[in-house]
Regions:
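Proteins enriched for Cys/Gly/acidic motifs involved in redox and nucleic-acid/cofactor modification
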Residues: 2-167
Length: 167
């Protein structure tokens, strides 16, 4: 499973290089699954290139529906018709924010809380608005609910996360 970044072209080139190396492993072990997710997969030109040049990839999904990972994996493993084709599930609708997803924390005393996604700045050097979508914020009630749950669980340090948390 490759969670990709597309902020720099070199990151894309590394992914293509790894996919090329994986082709021989896939020939030796056809049951091996190769899955790609993340910002790089939000670019249609990238997905098109992978579909034509890297047929050893089994599943592609984007940043907006990462929560569907288990569902897509189960489809590939258990659905006989899906085993013969590449599954591509990239959401272009960036307005939807899926709430109440399970969170795994690394530390018991601190946590991050996403308060917004995307960006409206469209800086000449940055691809974020194109792959993560326009700026959108979570509902304040949902943010507060999540923070209260974290505090009740013993978290004492909470970092608000987002591309532009001051917007």
């Amino acid at each position: 499973l490759y969670n990709t970044c597309t902020v720099r072209e070199n990151a894309n080139l590394k992914v293509y290089g790894h996919l090329g190396q994986l082709k021989r492993y896939k020939k030796k072990n056809p049951e091996m699954l190769t899955m790609l997710c993340g910002c790089m997969m939000q670019e249609q030109t990238v997905v098109d290139k992978i579909k034509t040049s890297y047929r050893n990839v089994d599943i592609i999904f984007g940043t907006h529906n990462i929560f569907k990972f288990a569902e897509l994996l189960a489809m590939r493993v258990f659905d006989t018709s899906a085993k013969k084709r590449m599954i591509v599930d990239v959401w272009k609708d960036t307005d939807a924010i899926v709430e109440e997803l399970p969170i795994e924390r690394k530390y018991s005393f601190k946590s991050g809380v996403n308060i917004m996604f995307g960006c409206n700045n469209f800086c000449s050097y940055c691809i974020v608005p194109y792959v993560r979508g326009r700026e959108r914020s979570r509902e304040p009630e949902e943010i507060i609910r999540e923070i209260r749950e974290l505090v009740a669980d013993g978290v004492v340090e909470i970092m608000l996360l987002g591309q532009n948390v001051n917007s």
